[in-house]
Design a protein with these regions (language model features):
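Bacterial Sec-dependent N-terminal signal peptides
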Residues: 1-16
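Accessory carbohydrate-binding/adhesion or oligomerization-edge regions at the termini
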Residues: 14-118, 198-202, 206, 279, ...
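Extended substrate-binding grooves/exosites of carbohydrate-active enzymes
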Residues: 16-52, 122, 172, 211, ...
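Accessory beta-strand-rich segments of carbohydrate-active enzymes
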Residues: 19-22, 50-51, 67-69, 97, ...
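Short glycine/proline/serine/threonine-rich loop/turn segments at secondary-structure transition edges
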Residues: 149-152, 192-196, 306-320
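Beta-strand-rich binding/interaction modules
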Residues: 167-169, 253-291, 300, 633
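Low-complexity, Pro/Ser/Thr- and charge-rich linker/hinge segments at domain boundaries
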Residues: 224-241, 344-359
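Surface beta-strand/loop "capping" patches
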Residues: 234-266, 617-633
Length: 636
């Protein structure tokens, strides 16, 4: 009800605006957010995690037909109809931002709205964005439903599209979505044909959602994450929640809890079974329950189980188990298989200190934007390169700044051992922190809740996620109080942080950014504090930097409630281009023109590594100070 009720409060004037100009229009006809229920063909594939190889998964990445216009009035309004001729259209790579493929202008700004500028003849006025200057990209491609999907449910998933889009299949309208960093899904089963099918997306560069995506990054547009289909039986596993903790006396015994939601219908009495296996493929826990009804809406809550001397997950020893879930029909035949990796670990604030498995942890962290030559589309290979470099340089924590990352990133963090601060895709920096802040405007609550909920539901089962973050640099007010309340109602274990909450109730960690060493010392000297000080950002690794790191870590290693922080940031957000003479060079804000384009210049380059992941010299300083073993010469 919290999500639906505010949508009917809009004024007549707002109702006359298109959906992409309304703060209430967070989505239409989308499936409820849930953990990833990857389809697998058999149990052996769950261990490998190779869901893309499943016969019930179909990628729609690749070449799409594309048409780009400078304003909505000139867009091809009927392009979504299969009969519409696209023979003269260009091809575009999906995923990939259109500015990196020859359309529009890549703009880099920091804390301002790029459209709040004379270049676009517009002053910020939420929820409105420029109309005449708002670019629209029309995407189309065809596909055939794979053999073996007959009689099964089919879901379309768009992992990330910025900033707002409408979607059709075979000319039939599915809905729309706003919010570029979490998946949106639609059930398209009854829209499909036996032969060729047509999918169409109409994408707007700016929307009301842009007011919540004012992050320090290149402002780009288009389909920037994967698009795919997956298929389930008519009765299917809709969601599941794994709680895998340690008992809090000795932190040696594992506590396993499992909830499974089943959707759809079946003709007989179905059952759900789970198996938990260790790294040697030995079954350590299992259970089975019959569903209470043949219809949809079944929620199965398994009894809590204990696992003595469990192999604990942490960043140094990322011990993982494999959970296998099987849905079975009345005859005991397996109709669906899915699963995930499970790590037993406890993340908590204990006696004023941030602890993993009961042990205080020093956060040796870094902030990470998603950045590549394609824009904000990052390949699996580049993600693996990032995490290997981080581990090689003693980094143990990554803050997903400032939005949920690609789903593969969490799998890597689970496997390699990296603590994750998962952050909701909310930053309204350009509105400031005062009375105009969107944090204080309750008409924006549905959007804040939607983004927070989608972050939590998709990533709730990852052991690497040890802290949730409500967002970044968006002021504080009723909307962040409500998102904190919601998260704490569903998350009983992991801490929640928000930098702009400062010492208000809606943060479990005092996580101010760029505070001096003296400020930290003064905080931990107080007698009234009960939250650890962990800087969500510090050092700002631009140019020849990180020179004050030693002084910070003298405090962190000697003051129990000062527990480190996350360096800003991991990678330079620049692009490598080639001039007319064949020489390469780095580009920064403003380099793509025109002359008066909004720009923060080379402020996009604050990384410990450059844009092609070559380490800067100060990364070695970080490696030295972040090392876990310190030696000193003594006289004997």
């Amino acid at each position: 009800m919290m999500l639906a009720a505010p949508a009917i409060i809009s004024t007549t004037a707002q109702q006359q605006q298109p959906e992409w100009q309304s703060q209430y229009a967070v989505g239409l006809n989308k499936l409820d957010p849930h953990t990833y229920v990857w389809p697998y063909a058999d149990a052996s594939e769950v261990e490998k995690g190779t869901f893309e190889q499943s016969p019930y998964y179909m990628s729609l990445n690749g070449q799409w037909k594309f048409h780009w216009v400078k304003n909505p009035d000139t867009r091809p309004k009927d392009f979504y109809k299969p009969s519409y001729y696209t023979g003269g259209w260009a091809d575009i790579k999906v995923p990939g931002n259109w500015e990196r493929q020859g359309y529009g202008t890549a703009i880099y700004v920091n804390e301002t709205y790029e459209f709040d500028d004379k270049m676009f003849n517009f002053k910020k006025n939420p929820p409105l964005v420029p109309y005449k200057e708002n670019e629209v990209g029309s995407y189309r491609r065809t596909f055939k439903v794979p053999a073996g999907w007959e009689g099964r449910r089919v879901v379309l998933c768009c992992e990330g599209v910025i900033s707002f889009y409408y979607v059709w299949v075979n000319g039939e309208f599915l809905g729309y979505n706003q919010g570029s960093k979490t998946a949106a899904e639609w059930d398209i089963t009854d829209k499909l044909t036996d032969g060729e099918n047509t999918i169409a997306l109409e994408v707007y560069r700016w929307s009301s959602g842009a007011y919540l995506e004012c992050q320090d990054m290149w402002r780009l547009s288009g389909i920037e994450r994967d698009v795919y289909l997956y298929s389930t039986p008519e009765q299917y596993i809709a969601d599941y929640k794994v709680t895998s903790l340690l008992e809090k006396e000795h932190y040696k015994e594992g506590i396993f809890e499992l909830e499974v939601a089943v959707g759809g219908t079946a003709s007989g009495t179905s059952s759900i079974a789970y198996t938990l296996k260790d790294a040697s493929d030995k079954t350590v826990l299992e259970g089975s329950r019959k569903l209470e009804s043949h219809g949809s809406g079944n929620l199965i809550v398994f009894d809590e189980q204990r696992l003595p001397d469990v192999r604990r997950w942490n960043a140094e020893h990322p011990e993982l188990y494999t959970l296998l879930l099987e849905l079975k029909d009345a005859g005991g035949k397996v109709t669906e298989i899915t699963g995930t990796k499970v790590g037993f670990r406890t993340s908590e604030i204990k006696n004023g200190r941030f602890c993993i498995n009961g042990v205080p942890v020093l956060v040796k962290g870094v902030n990470r934007h998603e950045h590549s030559q394609l824009g904000r589309t990052v390949s699996k290979e580049l993600m693996e390169q990032d995490i290997r470099l981080m581990k090689q340089h003693n980094i143990n924590t990554v803050r997903n700044s400032h939005y949920p990352a690609h789903p593969y990133w969490y799998q890597l963090c689970d496997r390699y051992g990296l603590y994750v601060i998962d952050e909701a895709n909310i930053e309204s920096h350009g509105m400031g922190y005062g009375p105009a802040s969107l944090a204080k405007d309750s008409t924006w609550l549905p959007a804040h809740i939607d983004r927070t909920r989608r972050m939590y539901e998709r990533s709730k089962n990852h052991p690497s996620v040890v802290i949730w973050s409500l967002g970044n640099e968006a002021g504080n007010g009723i909307n962040f109080e409500r998102t904190y309340d919601w998260l704490k109602s569903v998350e009983k274990n992991r801490p929640v942080q928000y930098e702009r909450a400062e010492e208000n109730y809606n943060t479990d960690i005092y996580c101010r950014m760029y505070r001096s060493v003296d400020v930290i010392r003064n905080y931990v000297a107080r007698k009234d504090i009960y939250r650890p000080f962990i800087l969500c950002e510090y050092l700002h690794a631009m140019g020849n930097s990180c020179g004050g790191m030693k002084e910070y870590w003298e405090v962190f290693e000697n003051e129990p409630m000062a527990q480190g922080g996350c360096i800003w940031d991991w990678v330079d957000q620049s692009f490598r281009e080639v001039d007319k003479d064949g020489k390469w060079y780095w580009t920064y804000g403003g380099d793509y023109g025109p002359k008066d384009v909004p720009s923060f210049g080379n402020f996009c380059c604050n990384g410990l590594v450059n844009a092609v992941r070559e380490p800067h010299p100060h990364l070695l300083e970080v490696k030295k100070i972040y090392q876990n073993i310190k030696l000193s010469l003594i006289h004997i």
